[in-house]
Amino acid sequence: MLSIRPKWVEKIASGEKTIEVRKTRPKLKTPFKAYLYVTAGNLSYRCPNGMICHCNGGRAVIGEFVCNKVDWITQIGFSGSPVPSRYSICSHSNMSVLPINDLLYAARLTYPELVDYLAGGEGYGWHISGLRIYDAPRKLSEFTGLRDTRFGAAPYGIKRAPQSWCYVEAMEEEETK
């Protein structure tokens, strides 16, 4: 479950924003399901199906998507070089390096915004596919969180929104319709 500010949720719900940049990522193989929790604030947005949705006060889960790919964002440069390092997309599998321009466009971020957010660290671009906006927002209490323990994942009742994201049990399909 991802906590996202209303202005970004509007862009995701409209299909304008197709990548969400985060400092961390789940230890899951892609594809995986992610739920969209909108933080405090009023939200009116046009869903992909054309209807206008309202979420007054925020603080609700408004939809879900499948993350089918996660890009690794890191700084590339040469130690001691007068040329400053720049953020790029790197592949763990073949160590190829790609320019970050397309990711920034899909995430609706500028390069300075990315630099400010990552503050010299690494990041991850979560690709959004199969977006589904619910007819009615869902309460946080309807979801079960999963906490990592030395014995495996332990379920717990979610009482407050995650700072960035948290693991949750997937809801059954008939429950999300």
Predicted regions and their residues:
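Structured alpha/beta reader/binder surfaces that contact nucleic acids or chromatin modification marks
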Residues: M1-K177
